[in-house]
């Protein structure tokens, strides 16, 4: 399965590595291109826009710092919501419940199913695979 990962900072890079370890085809996008080099060296395709990362992916993950960063990568002609095709979007970003509901409603208008699944824990917890996750969303 092709997976798109938007946000390859400290946590996103670790998650991307785990996805590659599991044998998934991975496309990544990060606003700072230099943050994608470690995953690219391991076989991930680096996209020039969030939309390009999402194209052809049945599953998309965002791991971003706040709702503004999620909106910046989701919206507009180059945003991942503009990519054609159906997909499941799992937002693991640091976003309030109200913002998460707003983003999910926008995704729904674009035919994208959305789940909110923020993670908590430190980088050390991520390395040890000990992050805590919560999930929320409508019926899939």
Question: What are the language-model segments listed below?
Answer:
Residues 1-59, 83, 87, 92, ...:
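NAD(P)+-binding Rossmann beta1-loop-alpha1 motif at the extreme N-terminus of oxidoreductases
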Residues 17, 21, 75, 105:
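Short, well-ordered alpha-helices that flank and scaffold nucleotide-derived cofactor binding pockets
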Residues 29, 63, 93, 134-136:
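Active-site-adjacent beta-strand anchor residues
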Residues 36, 57, 67-70, 100-103, ...:
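A general structural signal for well-ordered alpha-helical segments in protein cores
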Residues 39-42, 76-79, 83, 102, ...:
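Alpha-helical structural signal in soluble globular domains
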Residues 47-48, 61, 115, 134:
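A structural signal for hydrophobic residues in beta-strands of small regulatory alpha/beta folds
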Residues 60-80, 93-100:
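Beta-loop-alpha module in the N-terminal Rossmann-like domain of NAD(P)-dependent dehydrogenases
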Residues 73, 95-140:
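Rossmann-fold dinucleotide-binding core
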């Amino acid at each position: 399965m092709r997976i798109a990962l938007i946000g390859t900072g400290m946590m996103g890079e670790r998650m991307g590595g785990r996805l590659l370890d599991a044998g998934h085809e991975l496309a990544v996008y990060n606003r700072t291109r230099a943050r994608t080099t470690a995953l690219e060296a391991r076989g991930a395709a680096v996209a020039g826009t969030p939309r390009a990362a999402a194209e052809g992916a049945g599953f998309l993950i965002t791991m971003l710092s706040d709702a503004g960063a999620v909106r910046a990568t989701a919206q507009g002609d180059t945003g991942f919501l503009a990519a054609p095709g159906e997909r499941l979007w799992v937002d693991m970003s640091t976003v309030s419940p109200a913002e998460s509901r707003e983003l999910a409603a926008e995704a729904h208008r674009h035919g994208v199913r959305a789940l909110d699944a923020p993670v908590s824990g430190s980088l050390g917890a991520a390395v040890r695979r000990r992050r805590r996750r919560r999930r929320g969303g409508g019926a899939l």
